């Protein structure tokens, strides 16, 4: 039977079995391997279970299409990065760090949720509206979380998917969760009781049934530590991808290299200046890679 691991506490695995629509305990049957390496079951894993003598056994772990470290979870379909317009003030540098980090981790859909728009001044709203247009121009989905129409669109977007909310403390993630599914608070308490969560497990990740899919519940998960290399970051800005392939060097960092297609795109107003400026600020704080300059074959003369 197809199932998904919803929580791991010490060596106890809790799984949701789709056909039976139940959450129950399961134990691994032996050791799993992938590419000759031991594969340990983790939250978010899609698995196969069998009932043997009244005990559910995990007999197979399906291939993961992504894996996050913080929070520790696999197979996330959507990351919604929540940022507030005010209280705290919007910081595009922080927002772009989140976007790049999760795109580098192969999350297919990384979207933006803007909270507290209704508290902004008219002049600030005008700036935010332009910001939204800039992100949308680069194919990001942006939801204004105080707009009921956008909330309706967001509900459709996340339906039947595994959703992870990211963003700093105080930006309104809890408010959004309750708006998307008012019953979530009660069910979260019920699940916590079911799992016997104590103080030593308050930072463990778990999946909660949500919007016909799952919500990644990550207590204690707040600020993001960007642990990408400069090479990884150079490939993490999705709006750079269409231009980066025309850079002279295949491992171009888009900083001061000659014949950089990204810098040309910025000068031609194909990539917005403020996003490129944030990219440069992020790159300055990352450790240097040991680089071998690689020229693209098609550009060699």
Curated annotation (Swiss-Prot):
E.C. no: 3.6.1.-
Entries under InterPro entries matching the protein: G_CP_dom, P-loop_NTPase, Ribosome_biogen_GTPase_RsgA, RsgA_GTPase_dom
Protein localization: Cytoplasm
Classification via PROSITE patterns: ENGC_GTPASE, G_CP
Binding residues annotated for Zn(2+), in chain numbering: 247, 252, 254, 260
Pfam families: RsgA_GTPase
GO biological process, one term: ribosomal small subunit biogenesis
Protein name as it appears in the record: Small ribosomal subunit biogenesis GTPase RsgA
Naturally occurring in which organism (per UniProt): Ureaplasma urealyticum serovar 10 (strain ATCC 33699 / Western)
């Amino acid at each position: 039977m197809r199932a998904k691991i919803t929580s791991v506490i010490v060596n106890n695995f809790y799984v949701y079995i789709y056909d039976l629509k139940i959450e129950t305990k399961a134990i691994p049957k032996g050791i799993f391997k992938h590419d000759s390496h031991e594969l340990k079951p983790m939250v978010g894993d899609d698995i196969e279970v069998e009932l043997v003598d009244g005990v559910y056994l995990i007999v197979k772990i399906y291939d993961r299409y992504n894996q996050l470290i913080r929070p520790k979870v696999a197979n996330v379909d959507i990351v919604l990065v929540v940022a507030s317009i005010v209280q705290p003030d919007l910081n595009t540098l922080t927002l772009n760090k989140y976007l790049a980090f999760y795109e580098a981790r192969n999350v297919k859909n990384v979207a933006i949720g803007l909270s507290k728009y209704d508290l902004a001044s008219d002049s600030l709203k005008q700036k935010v509206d332009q910001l939204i247009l800039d992100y949308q121009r680069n194919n990001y989905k942006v939801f204004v979380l105080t707009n009921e129409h956008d909330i309706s669109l967001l509900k459709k977007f996340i339906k039947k998917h595994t959703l992870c909310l990211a963003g700093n403390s105080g930006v309104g993630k809890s408010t959004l969760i309750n708006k998307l599914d008012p019953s979530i608070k009660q069910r979260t308490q019920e699940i916590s009781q079911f799992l016997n969560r104590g103080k030593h497990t308050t930072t463990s990740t778990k999946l909660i049934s949500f919007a016909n899919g799952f919500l990644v519940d990550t207590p204690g998960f707040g600020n993001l530590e960007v642990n990408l290399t400069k090479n990884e970051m150079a490939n993490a800005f999705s709006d750079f991808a269409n231009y980066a392939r025309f850079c002279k060097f295949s491992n171009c960092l888009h900083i001061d290299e000659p014949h950089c297609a990204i810098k040309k795109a910025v000068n031609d107003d194909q990539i917005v200046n403020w996003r490129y400026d944030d990219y440069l600020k992020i790159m300055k704080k990352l450790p240097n890679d040991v680089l071998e300059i690689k020229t693209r074959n098609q550009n060699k003369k």
